[in-house]
Design a protein with these regions (language model features):
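Glycine-rich hexapeptide-repeat left-handed beta-helix
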Residues: 43-70, 104, 108-113, 118-160, ...
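Extended, small-residue-rich solenoid/repeat segments and analogous flexible loops
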Residues: 34-92, 100
């Protein structure tokens, strides 16, 4: 291919790419005309083409209930974030671009008020029931107790519980069973799985906390730590006096202000009642039976 024809071809490809982006981007932000499904097309149950990032879960052998996310009106969910199923998003929570709260396996998932899920955060959980049988140690009570399947509190427990004023920094994975106490900071690219973090804990970047351990209140997990035994957790230093002593206060403040500010822009979703009306009007009739 000569140079002239090559330039012509690349120009055509560039124009086509721009046209595609101009079509996709406005709809991702709830702008422009939202196309209606053609005959034979399927739309996810209790989702909408205007807010495809927020929708209910599906029925499985480990989850017999269909649940829509519960989102407080003052929370901000970015259009490029995803919230599915049995997720509770509390007051003034910021859910940043590419963050995911996926309550379709282990449930429920709880994000307390004034907390933040920064870019790339994932919250998910292992199944908590199978064929309506409760699984031991797969849920936590709101006070941090780990629950057996026959515990009377199991039905009110959580696969993942994130308290209030908690910061989950960029790329954090919280995978249930997991518990994160109030005023706790979890640093970038860290993993918390099958573990409990107490109140006022600071976790340094790129740390791993797993193996059923419990990190006590006011502890500091140094960057890059791998905590897999209770002995390692008990030996952790105090947060006060560490480089992370006051980090969470500043991070919570920043993200609370961001949630407020973005909530005033057109990116913000409407009220829960408005969202439900659009979702009900736009979805196809779908069976709720397995």
């Amino acid at each position: 291919m000569d140079r002239k024809n090559y330039q012509l071809l690349t120009g055509i490809i560039a124009i086509a790419g721009i046209a595609i982006l101009m079509t996709i981007i406005p709809q991702c932000y709830g702008q422009g005309n939202v196309s209606q499904p053609q005959q034979g097309e399927q739309v996810a149950p209790n989702s909408s083409q205007q807010w495809p990032n927020i929708h209910e879960n599906v029925i499985t052998d480990f989850n017999s209930n269909v649940t829509s996310p519960s989102i407080q009106g003052s929370a901000f969910i970015h259009p490029f974030a995803v919230v599915i199923g049995n997720c509770y998003i509390g007051q003034n929570v910021l859910v940043a671009p590419t963050a995911v709260c996926r309550g379709d396996e282990g449930t429920p998932l709880y994000i307390g008020p004034f907390s933040n899920m920064q870019d790339g955060v994932v919250i998910h959980g292992l199944e908590t029931t199978v064929d309506d049988n409760n699984l031991d140690d797969r849920r936590f009570a709101s006070n941090g107790d780990r629950l057996l399947g026959n515990d009377t509190r199991f039905d009110d427990g959580y696969s993942v519980y994130v308290g209030e004023n908690v910061s989950l920094a960029h790329g954090v994975l919280i995978h249930g069973p997991a518990y994160v106490g109030n005023n706790t900071f979890v640093g970038m690219e860290s993993l918390v799985f099958d573990a409990k973090l107490g109140n006022d804990v600071a976790v340094g970047v790129s740390s791993t906390i797993t193996g059923g351990v419990e990190v006590a209140d006011d502890k500091f997990v140094p960057p890059g730590s791998v905590i897999t035994t209770q002995e390692e957790a008990d030996a952790l230093p105090e947060r006060v006096g560490s480089a992370y002593e006051n980090i969470n206060t500043a991070v919570v403040h920043v993200n609370e202000k961001l949630a407020d500010g973005y909530g005033e822009l057109g990116l913000e979703m409407p009220s829960a009642s408005e969202r439900e009306n659009v979702m009900e009007g736009g979805m196809l009739e779908t069976s709720r039976t397995p």
